[in-house]
């Protein structure tokens, strides 16, 4: 009698040792009280950050900034993993110490951004597809050798109810691309972080965002199953359910918490170890408070934590200003924000970390990472 997997013509299973390694890494990334530092800004994106503090975008300055982040003593108490840009994975600081080693010193797992950016989907109104599947398997092998143990692939969708966005074509393209990426990563021992980001652009209500997010996540997990992705060895990086940035209707952090949790419960299998939210242009304080509201509704079948870039780094950059004499203070600010988000993963954040500057909006229209 044929086995069920043979009858169903199911995708080939991962070797047991690979599956075990992936599941172990995924669990470590979402261990209690910790989240992920997204420091994988492209060279073009980091230029925008440096322009804001009037700092030249040189390889030396980029290395100095990464050294500031990864050399922060005690960061590993709140941060489990760090997503790196390819340059950073192979980079050393001024003292000749590899950035990966700085992370290892804090028991932080190195990860790598593997997508190659966005292009327009033909026959759509500028909806986006993510590039990077060609040659991904070979790159994953090199990244693993260099010390990376997980990867990230970002897709974006836009809500525009008047134009019927996101279209079914866009959602399918997003889901299938994420699933192919995830499968390739797992075949090469990297835990895939699956990131279907629905941008906050536009005037749509929080209820519309909930409906669209539910549809997108449903399609993503269907595609993951069809591609044989081991859910126990993967993580999801979604947007929180929020109103569009131009929406005039008032919403509360409790609204964000309730609708985000409801959406996840309707779509995300409990086999997945965890969900690591993106901040999506929320202020540092909003990102912490909303994460707190989400976790206050627990217990949940998955860990619900953070994978923040701007919401962990904005005040750090403003404090640093590219000056060596500001490094120690900037590291204090990083620890303060990381601890705030750690508390939020327990639903115990009371607010107020970072003062007034933490409340500044970090929203960028049509955000490119």
Curated annotation (Swiss-Prot):
Keyword Lyase: yes
Positions annotated as active site in the UniProt record: 195, 237
Keyword Ribosomal protein included in the entry's annotation: no
Database matches in InterPro entries: Aldolase_I_AS (IPR029768), Aldolase_TIM (IPR013785), FBA_I (IPR000741)
GO biological process: glycolytic process
Transmembrane segments: none
Ligand binding (D-glyceraldehyde 3-phosphate): 42, 45, 113, 195
Effect on the protein upon substituting residue 40 to G: Reduces binding to TRAP
Annotated membrane topology: Peripheral membrane protein
Coiled coil: none
Domain of life, per lineage: Eukaryota
Record function comment: Plays a key role in glycolysis by catalyzing the cleavage of fructose 1,6-bisphosphate into dihydroxyacetone phosphate and glyceraldehyde 3-phosphate.
Similarity annotation: Belongs to the class I fructose-bisphosphate aldolase family.
UniProt cross-references to PANTHER family, sorted A to Z: FRUCTOSE-BISPHOSPHATE ALDOLASE (PTHR11627)
Protein name (Swiss-Prot/TrEMBL): Fructose-bisphosphate aldolase
Gene giving rise to this polypeptide: FBPA
